[in-house]
A protein has these predicted regions:
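Short beta-strand segments
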Residues: 1, 33, 59-63
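Active-site/ligand-binding-proximal alpha/beta "capping" segment
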Residues: 27-49
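Conserved structured core elements
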Residues: 10-13, 37-41, 151, 192
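Glycine-rich, flexible loop/turn motifs
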Residues: 12-15, 28, 139, 175
């Protein structure tokens, strides 16, 4: 089963390759592949937060198994503060203090942002004017083919991934699940909703005298 085989939403490990690498050029993205309903809820919230904060696509890989699954989750699991909206958007007061060029244009794509995620303005804000193009741009947004600018912009984008990884590792749950004995001869790596299936296989193999453990990864 897999894409374009008549069962397009069935789980398949190869789907991850498509999600990770289908793009034009070297671009940044975040991919979540929840293993169960709890992770789907947590990671959907986190995906919106990261997409706004770091200005990049955040993809949550749901499939038929999770969508059709019936699972009991304690109501206390959902008892949490709402996620703040529009992370990374500057207020007009903050824009007044932000960097602008000599013509008063907001430097939307500054090279020196520490975490790589440039704060942004939204249309109509005073002091937020800048240019948006589909090509590589310099700090205000004008198209630039300068090698130095290109390197600086790509370095900035790559810093996003380092910052996001640190952000995810600081979460209460890392969504990396170890299963089986702490020491084993063989290891299995699985992502997404097929995690429980692989964990069951680990139990069966160990019951037969094999030495197997597994790691489920979903972010």
């Amino acid at each position: 089963a897999g894409p374009s085989t008549g069962m397009p939403t069935k789980p398949e490990q190869a789907d991850l390759e498509h999600v990770l690498y289908t793009s034009q050029g070297d671009s940044c993205r975040v991919v979540f592949a929840p293993a169960n309903v709890r992770e789907a809820y947590d990671q959907t919230r986190k995906a919106f937060e990261l997409a706004y904060s770091y200005n990049l696509p955040a993809i949550v890989v749901y499939d038929q198994k999770i969508q059709g699954e019936l699972r009991t989750v304690p109501v206390e699991f959902f008892d949490r503060e709402p996620t703040a909206g529009m992370e990374g958007v500057l207020t007009e007061d903050e824009l007044a203090e932000a960097a602008h060029d000599a013509s008063g244009n907001f430097m939307r794509y500054r090279h020196d942002v520490e975490d790589g995620g440039n704060p942004r303005s939204i249309p109509g804000q005073t002091g937020g004017r800048h240019l948006v193009t589909g090509n590589e741009s310099q700090e205000v947004g004008h198209i630039s083919e300068s090698p130095d600018n290109r390197k600086a912009q790509m370095d900035r984008r790559m810093r996003k991934l380092t910052s996001i990884r640190e952000d995810l590792d600081e979460m209460d749950s890392s969504h990396q699940t170890h299963y089986g004995p702490s020491e084993a001869t063989h290891g299995l790596l699985v992502w997404g909703s097929q995690q429980d299936t692989v964990f069951e296989a680990v139990d069966r193999l160990n019951a037969r005298g094999e030495s197997v453990k597994a790691l489920g990864v979903s972010d």
